[in-house]
Amino acid sequence: MVSIIIVNYHTSHLLLHCVDALEEQVKGVDYEIIVADNASSEEELVLLRDDKRFTLLELDENVGFGNANNAAAQMAKGDYLLLLNPDTVLLNDAVTLLFRYMDAHPEVGICGGNLYDSDLQPTHSFHRLYPSFLSEMDFALGQVYRKIRFRGNAQFNSSEHPIEVAMITGADLMIRTDVWNKLKGFDTCFFMYGEDADLCKRCKQLGYGVVAIPEAHIQHLEGKSFMESESHCRRILDGRFTYFNKHYGTLYNKLTDAMNILSLHIAVFIYRLRRNERAVTKFSNRLRIYKEYATKHKLHR
């Protein structure tokens, strides 16, 4: 059986749409749904309490993505956990496809499918690199290295076969329950962002594979405007700060932050030479956010 865990925070309408799609699409495996609510409003909870399709876990406060999943996982009965975002919609029986792959490949600890955006275009589904000095520099410069090295498979599996990756995003992550228990779930030091990278890294350290399955199709409705918003950028930086401190230490964090700021200055300069005002605006905003964040955490000297 697969235990599907969905963390909700003021997204009840989206969550119910997600559950509708699960009910419609999943035919090949037994499953249960556990919803962990991060102290949403009473109006939101009213929409969920009487729904018999899932078990509702009402948390007293917003404990973050990872901690809410940890709490729900303690209630799970399945041999596999599938962590799903509430703004996801199954486009096929992705749950069964992921389950069957895991069941046939005991050496794999974590897997995930291909994600599509609101326009049904391929979107980031995994990462081929762990967060690091190199990945941060590449991101600051527009992910040139990843595009060259991995071609069409940097964040989306455009091949016809499973591929080994560094990490699966937390939007659709299936993990063996026994592996989850060995890892003790998500590290509680993460609030939101970074916990999926940390989980996958620790999974690989146990000797298990992390694999992207192209046949499993899931729509992820997270808006493109939000992806570029200051709020999203700052949350990612919080996760990065925690991840680097845990795995590499404070000095590494400081060096990476300084490198990011330098790389963004270079990117702005290059796009100005090319007279690409849209890119100049994008990278200038990103540079401002990095500088403010670095100052806040006393990482930029």
Q: What are the residue ranges of the model-derived segments?
A:
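A short, conserved alpha-helix in the catalytic core of glycosyltransferases
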Residues: 158-160, 166-217
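N-proximal low-complexity "stem/linker" segments adjacent to membrane-targeting elements
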Residues: 1-24
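Non-catalytic, C-terminal membrane-associated alpha-helical segments of glycosyltransferases
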Residues: 231-239, 251-301
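Short, flexible, basic/aromatic active-site loop/helix in glycosyltransferases
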Residues: 130-165
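Nucleotide-sugar-dependent glycosyltransferase catalytic core
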Residues: 123, 200, 212, 217-239, ...
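Conserved donor NDP-sugar-binding/catalytic core segment of glycosyltransferases
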Residues: 91-125
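Acidic donor-binding segment of Leloir-type glycosyltransferases
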Residues: 19-61, 71
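Short aromatic/hydrophobic "clamp" motif used to bind/position activated sugar donors
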Residues: 81
